[in-house]
Amino acid sequence: MKKTTLLILIAALAATPFSASAAAKKKSRPRRPQTVGPAINENKATPISRIKAAPGFKVELVYSVPGSNQGSWVNLGLDDKGRIIASDQFGGLYRFPLPAPGKKLDPKLVKKMPVNIRAVNGILWAFDALYVAVNDYERKIDSGVYRITDSTGDGELDKVEKLRAMQASGDHGVHALLLSPDKKSIHLITGNNTEPTASQKSRVPRAWGEDHLLTRMPDGRGHNRGRLGPAGIIYKMSPDGKQWEIISSGYRNIFDGGFNRDGELFTYDADMEYDFNTPWYRPTRVNHVTSGSMYGWRNGTGKRPEFYPDTLPATINIGPGSPTGVTFGYGAKFPAKYQNALYILDWSWGKVYAVHLKPEGSSYTATKEEFIIGSPFPVTDAIIHPKDGAMYVSIGGRRVQSGLYRVTYTGKESTTPAKHQPNRSKLVSLRKKLEKFHSPNAQAIKQAWPHLTHSDRFVRWAARTAVMHQPIKQWSGKALKEKDHGKRVEALLALSKMGGIDPSHRKDSDAPVDTGLARKIVNSLLQVDWNKLQTEQQLTLIRAYQICFNRFDRPGRSNVEKIVQHLDPHFPAQTFELNWLLCETLAYLQSPSVAYKGMQLIKNAPTQEEQMEYARSLRFVKQGWSTSLRREYFEWFFKAANYRGGASFSKFIEFIRNDAVASLSRTDQVKLKDILDKKPVRKSPLEMLAEAMAGRSYIKEWKLDELSKIAATGMKNRSYANGRKMFGAVGCFACHRFANEGGMTGPDLTGSSGRYNTHDLLDQIVNPSKEINEQFVPIEVITLDGRKATGIVVNLNGDSVTVNTDMFDPNQRESFDRKSLKSLEPSKVSPMPEGLLNMLKKEEILDLLAYVLSAGEANNAMFAKKK
C-alpha cells in the first residue's frame, strides 16, 4: 500500500506542467486572461490585452517608446508646468505634455531635453530647479546628484551643475530624489554599490560593523565580495548640495521611496535571488524608514535576519522580485482606499502592488494587493498626475521595449479626495521625541533610558540609538550596573558596539580596544538571569555576547567556561530564532555539547533552511564529536546536495562542507576517508518528495465537506510543533514561503488567515486547480520553429525572455528571443498535485491547518492547552 501510494503521488506530480505548490486566492486580485494570444513580435509596448488591473480600474497604453531613438525609460517626474519628464536608462531626458483624457500621446510632442545629462535614475522638481540622480553604468559622466536650471530666463533648462559626484556601479547605484516633508531639503536613495559619501551628520551611529561571530561565507558567485556596511544609504541633503546627513542604512537595492501624509518615509528593498532557500534569504520588502534605522544588509551569508535586535523588521515582506518605482496614491481620482495606498513596482514579475498601510504601535503593518499585473510588464516607475488624477506607469529598463500607460478609475465608488486623519498616537509621539536625541544631547540618557525595554520595537530602537549617540563615559557605568536585566542587555549591546571596533572596519590608526571594558561587559552579561528575560530579550542577550566577542576579542578560557554554563542549559530552545543564535554562539565557544545537540536539531528540522543554519554553525566545531556523530554530520551533505535554491545555493553547501573538512584533525580525516571521498547521488524533486513521505501509508481520500466539518470543531488544543512538522512532511516548505522559511516557487502562505477561513483554506488544498494564483500559473512558450517550454517568465533583457522551467529549481532557465515567439499560453492545471492530505491522519491535518492559520505564531490561541 505504501509503495502504491507513493507511486500515485509521483504520477500526480509528474502530470503537472512542473512541480510547484498550492495557489492562494485574493478576492480583489486582477485576473489574468485565460488566453494570452500571440506573442509580441513587433517593436511595440505590451498590449492592453496582456495587462489586467484591479476591478473598476482601466489601463490604457498611451505611448510605445521607439527604442532606437528614445531608449528604454526607467524614471518619471513632473516639471513646474505639469509636463512629464522621462529618462532613458542609457540616454537623456524626454519631456512631453499630459495626454488628453482617453487619448494617446502624440509622438511629435515627445521632445528630448537639450541638456547635457544622461542615465538619470531620479527626477525631482524643487527649489525652482530640476534635480536629477545619475547612475551611469557606462561611466560617460559621473554618477551623483545634479541640478539643472534656466540660466537665461527663456523657459528652457540649460545649466547643469554637479552638486555631488558619487562612486557607484551597476544597478545598485544612485537612485531616487524625494522632497522632504518640510519642503526644505531633499532625500537621496542609494543602492548598496554606492560608496558612502561624506556627510556632516548621521542619525545612524557611526559604529559601522559586520558583527559576524563565525566567519562569513561570501556569495558563491562572487557577488559583492568585500562590500562592507554601511550600504544602501538614505541621505538628506540641503538644496545647494553642501550639507549631508545619513538618515538610514542597511538596504540592498532600494530604487525609490515615498512619504506619507504624516511625513513617514517608506521604501521597497530588493532581495538577493542567489540566496533563495537559504536561512539568510530575505524577500523583497517594504520598510519604514525611521531616524537612525538600519535594515541589516551585509554581503554573502552576513545578512541580518529580522529577529536580530540590531536590525529592524520589514513593514511587510512581499516575495521574490525586482523593486523599482514607489509612490503614494495621493491626488489620484481613485476610491479612498487606493488614494491612501503605497504603490510599489516589481520589474521582474510585472506587477504594481497596492500596499495598504495600517498604523500599529509607533510603526505600521500592511497588506498587499496585486493592483496591476502583466506579462511581459517590466514596470519601472509610476506617478500620480495632479491635473487629471490618473496614474502614469512606465515600462522599460535594460534596453527592453518601453511604454507609457495611464491608469484611471471607472467604477462606481466615490473618488472624492480622502480626508487625512493624522496619526497622533502616543507611541508615535514617543518615538519621534526620542528621535530628536539622535545626536549628542545632554538630556538624551535621562530621556531614553527608561524606554530601553519598551514593548514597541521601534520605540526601543529609537531609545537605544539615542543612547549610542552619547559619549560612552556618560553611560557605560550605568549600563554595566543596570538592575533591570532587560534594560541591561539592551544597554550592553549598545556598549559593545560603541566601545569596540569591528575587525573588518578596524584601521591601522585606531587605538587598541579596551579589553578591560570587554571583561566588564562579559561579567555583567553573566549576571543576567535568563529566566527573567522575555524571548526578545534573550535574543538580545545572546547577540550582545556575540557583538562583544567580535568587536573586542574572544574571551579568556575561564570566562568561556562561564559563558557556556550560562547559555548551554537553554539550548536547544523552543524557537528556531533562539536556536540559531545559541547554536552559533556555543559553536564559537567550542561547547562540548553543541555538536550532539546541533545534530539532533538537524535531524528534526522540517526545513532545509533550518538544517542548513545549524550545519553552518557546526562547521568549525572541534569538540564533542564521536566518529559516528561526525559521520552523521557529513552524511547530511548527501541530502543537502539535492536541496534546491538560488544560483549560489550549491556553492554555499560546498563552502560549509569545505570548512567542516578543514576543521578535522588529520586522524579524523583518515577515519572518515570513505565518507569524505563519497560523491552525492543526484535525485529528482519527485524522488526527494517520495523519500520525505516514506514510512507513511495511505489513510483515505479526504473530501472537502468531511474535512470542513471536522475542522469546524477541532481547531483547539492543537500542536504547533506537529503542525510545523506536517508542513514539511507533505512538501509545503519545498515551494511555499512561510514565516520567513521555505521555497519561493509558490505563494507565500504566511498571511493565509487574512485571506481564508478554514473551509476556504481546505478547498485550496483539496482542489488546487479550482483557482490558481496568477503569479504561479505556468506559461507554455511556443516559438515560430515549434520549440516548446513551460514555466514562469522571470527575466527580460533587451529582446531576451527568460523562463524558469523547473519550479523546484530556480536555476533551471531557458531564454528565448521574443521576436521568435509564436505564442504564450497559460495552463489551467495547478502545479500543485491533488491528494497531498491523503497520507495524513485527522489530527495531523488539523495541526497542519492550525499552523498555517496561525501565521507561524506558536502562542496563537489554537495551540493553548486545556488547564
Model-based region annotation:
Residues 396, 409-726, 745, 752-754, ...:
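Long, ordered, helix-rich scaffold segments
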Residues 62, 130, 697-709, 766, ...:
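C-terminal capping alpha-helices of c-type cytochrome domains
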Residues 1-26:
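Bacterial Sec-dependent N-terminal signal peptides
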